[in-house]
Amino acid sequence: MSCTTDKLIQKYDALVRKTTEHKFAKELCAGTLKDRSLYIYLSQDLQFFETSLRLICKTTSLAPTTHALITLAKKIGFFSNDENSYFHDCLELLAPSLTKEERDNFDNKAIPGVDAYINFLDELRKDASITWPSLVTSLWVAEELYWRWARDTPRAPGLHWKYQKWIDLHDGEHFQTWCEFLKAEVDKFPVEEVESIFVKVSQFEFEFFESCYNA
């Protein structure tokens, strides 16, 4: 019998694929994504990252087992070091592709499509009624979608580090192990309990790509 996460992926296959096969991901992996587009995406993702990190801290505090608590706590450290360093190094490299006025705008204001996602995560963080099943599902689906595009999208050889590092952060054994941990946690709950948040986050992830690509 299929588990909860497999049932959700199968039921919403079209939604999953339109996100994981988005032209943003395809062009990034092909090494053809414009510097401007990558800058906009990363500047927006950095704003998203800070809100998301606060939510992960809440999720960690509600972990039902010691194993889950330690796993999440370790991941917070990874996010704060490896991923955060990439943001700043890459944004500095890509800065000449936009005017200073454009950079200031994208660095300090979430664009439509991204702002709704950030607001949604902030609501999850602030709402005391949101419990572990919803929180761990929101984290799992976001990470699962990233792992799928990073793992499955054809890559050009010899990619510039601005592309390759972002792919590497979301692929490989370290990320697979992380996603499998989250998947196992979500599978402890019935589809009906986590379906709504799965759909919401999946749609937000698509809109994030779409908004940044077209900005």
Swiss-Prot record:
> Which terms in the GO cellular component ontology are assigned?
cytosol
Question: Entry's InterPro entries?
Answer: Haem_Oase-like_multi-hlx, TenA_E, Thiaminase-2/PQQC, Thiamine_Salvage_TenA
Provide a GO biological process annotation.
Answer: thiamine metabolic process
User: Record's superkingdom?
Assistant: Eukaryota
Q: Which Pfam families match?
A: TENA_THI-4
- Family, per the entry? Belongs to the thiaminase-2 family.
Database matches in PANTHER family: BIFUNCTIONAL TH2 PROTEIN (PTHR43198), SI:CH1073-67J19.1-RELATED (PTHR43198:SF2)
Print the miscellaneous field.
Present with 195 molecules/cell in log phase SD medium.
Q: What is this protein called?
A: Protein PET18
Q: Which organism is it from?
A: Saccharomyces cerevisiae (strain ATCC 204508 / S288c)
- Native organism taxonomy: Eukaryota, Fungi, Dikarya, Ascomycota, Saccharomycotina
Q: Which gene encodes it?
A: PET18
